[in-house]
Amino acid sequence: MAPKAEKKPAAKKPAEEEPAAEKAEKAPAGKKPKAEKRLPAGKAEKSSGEGKKAGRKKAKKSVETYKIYIFKVLKQVHPDIGISSKAMSIMNSFINDIFEKLAGESAKLARYNKKPTITSREIQTSVRLVLPGELAKHAVSEGTKAVTKFTSA
């Protein structure tokens, strides 16, 4: 194998050329000097832009949560009560868990019936299978009400 070429240190940027002592001298007598901009350790090493186009920022991964909806329901039911961030996180995990169970059960039902599409009928049946007793009845009635409101609008 051929020996790898030595890496050259990255050229100094204009902001880094002046030492901090010189910047302090330029500052007015009563004020503190402005802090220098520094790159995080991981970004300073990757300044050459290997593998990615230079200048392009990495897009933030959007994280979808039910937090705002949980808060709205809480305020409808108990307007005077708040919720801690840990309790909110637990509620969000709970809703995600129920959603995954319902989606999995609906997918199974669609496969059993050799249907390529999950319809409201599969969702309703999966709600009856996953949720216990009275909770399933209330969920089905609220779901039916929501679907009729959606189709009529």
Curated annotation (Swiss-Prot):
PROSITE patterns membership: HISTONE_H2B (PS00357)
Keyword DNA-binding on entry: yes
Pfam families: Histone (PF00125)
Region (Disordered) location: 1-61
Recorded superkingdom: Eukaryota
GO cellular component, one term: nucleus
Cross-link (Glycyl lysine isopeptide (Lys-Gly) (interchain with G-Cter in ubiquitin)): 149
Keywords annotated in UniProt: Acetylation, Chromosome, DNA-binding, Isopeptide bond, Nucleosome core, Nucleus, Ubl conjugation
Basic and acidic residues bias locations: 1-28, 36-53
Residues with N6-acetyllysine modification: 7, 37
Post-translational modification: Can be acetylated to form H2BK6ac and H2BK33ac.
Family matches, as CDD domains: HFD_H2B
Compartments, record wording: Nucleus; Chromosome
MF annotations from Gene Ontology: DNA binding; protein heterodimerization activity; structural constituent of chromatin
Keyword match Ubl conjugation: yes
Chain's role: Core component of nucleosome. Nucleosomes wrap and compact DNA into chromatin, limiting DNA accessibility to the cellular machineries which require DNA as a template. Histones thereby play a central role in transcription regulation, DNA repair, DNA replication and chromosomal stability. DNA accessibility is regulated via a complex set of post-translational modifications of histones, also called histone code, and nucleosome remodeling.
Family to which this protein belongs: Belongs to the histone H2B family.
Subunit structure: The nucleosome is a histone octamer containing two molecules each of H2A, H2B, H3 and H4 assembled in one H3-H4 heterotetramer and two H2A-H2B heterodimers. The octamer wraps approximately 147 bp of DNA.
Protein name (record): Histone H2B.10
Lineage of the organism: Eukaryota, Viridiplantae, Streptophyta, Embryophyta, Tracheophyta
